[in-house]
Design a protein with these regions (language model features):
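C-terminal beta-strand-loop-alpha-helix "lid" module of Rossmann-like NAD(P)-dependent dehydrogenases
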Residues: 1-240
Length: 240
């Protein structure tokens, strides 16, 4: 009976059928993730552009989210996957962070995805947080929770900078590793040029305080956008 079962499992074509089934599942997941990423991207881009525009016209606002708080520690939110067999998807993100120029001893990894966390542990990085289950089915509330963790650490002076590393989704075959700085918020070069050519806007104290609400929403939106782009990119990588 065991011999017959072994023979049956190795029949020509059986493996091909399984491979085709798995590819079909991956195709469906990719289509769903791609639709989600493409439909959400304009919103997150608008949020980013809005914050950049406000800051470029604001003059010199003194706010904790815009200035260095004295801590040399760097929080890096790293988005990878929980599974391998995705080409260079996971390794590219790990390498991007390792080659970023941030001193290893100053970096605290907020890991989303077991593969990335395992790689950073082998390299001797400090893992501040492991929220790997999030990437299976990421929700906006998950992004809010990660945002809360890093913002609380920033407000307490435990970290001085916040970065985000993930794989950006361009299309089904083009996925680009991204490494961006979230805090302190920096004005893009082109926005900075525009800022110098315009008279600064006058802000009342209440308006400056509104950054307490705006910046966390901005951070949460960028993190969630990274989650859904990463999921689409991962599924795309598995199809190649």
């Amino acid at each position: 009976l065991c011999v017959n079962r072994l023979w049956t499992n190795t029949l020509p074509g059986r493996g091909n059928t399984w491979a085709k089934a798995m590819k079909l599942v991956s195709t469906v997941k990719l289509q769903k993730a791609r639709t989600r990423a493409e439909s959400a991207k304009p919103y997150f881009q608008k949020m980013y552009d809005t914050v950049q525009s406000i800051l470029s016209k604001s003059g010199n606002i003194e706010h904790p989210y815009l200035t260095f708080n004295g801590s040399e520690k760097k929080a890096v939110i790293v988005v990878t996957s929980n599974r391998g067999l995705a080409g260079g998807y996971n390794n590219n993100i790990v390498k991007l962070v390792a080659d970023s120029g941030l001193p290893k001893e100053s970096v605290e990894i907020y890991g989303i995805g077991k593969k990335g966390i395992e790689s950073f542990e082998r390299r001797g990085y400090y893992i501040a947080s492991d929220d790997s289950d999030i990437i299976n089915e990421p929700l906006f509330s998950d992004a809010v929770e990660i945002g809360r963790k890093v913002l609380d650490a920033y407000a307490a002076g435990e970290i001085g900078e916040i970065y985000l590393a993930y794989t950006g989704f361009k299309n089904t075959v083009v996925h680009t590793p991204e490494f961006i700085k979230l805090l302190p918020v920096e004005v893009k070069a082109e926005e900075e040029s525009e800022k110098k050519s315009q008279a600064p806007m006058n802000y009342e104290p209440e308006a400056e305080e509104s950054l307490d609400l705006l910046i966390p929403k901005y951070i949460n939106s960028i993190i969630y956008g990274a989650f859904i782009e990463a999921v689409a990119s991962e599924n795309g990588a598995r199809m190649q």
